[in-house]
Amino acid sequence: MTVALSNLPVLETERLILRAPCASDFPALAPFIMSDRSKYVGGGADKDETHAWRVLAILTGHWPLRGFGTFVLEDRKTGAPIGSAGPWYPAGWPEKELGWTIWTEEAEGKGFAYEAVLELRRHTYEDLGWTTAVSYIDPKNTRSIALAERLGCTLDPDAAGPDPDEPLLVYRHPSPEALA
């Protein structure tokens, strides 16, 4: 028996369908989590399928716990899941985050994360009523730093990160008013 999360939003952009994660995303997510490409988001070559499954379960479980969560980025042309992005706010975190990952090298550098985050930022401000959002980024993750800056985010050196033992850069997204 498969149980689906119902009544979750599905958003669309020119090239993407943004939807909640599901079990069929595992074959695309697992290789990413088990590679060094995911080292900035809790994965890495030392991780196994069990760890990757837990990541999928965490992404999925955030939805019923918070009423929002990370979306899977599905390529409209191929139907393939190519990444994830969206609102994220685990217990104990100082602020609500907009995060993103691209799962395959083939999908990197094509603007998919940018396209998704623009729509997801609109969604969080207009539909969820957020008034601010940050993105927590590892200082070595130059691609995500560049994307945050392209999105108009600014480094907020006074903002706290989620873990004092893991120093992350805090990039603040423009406010809804600044984007209007």
Question: Predicted segment positions?
Answer:
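Active-site rim helix/loop that mediates acceptor-substrate recognition in acyltransferases
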Residues: 48-67, 76
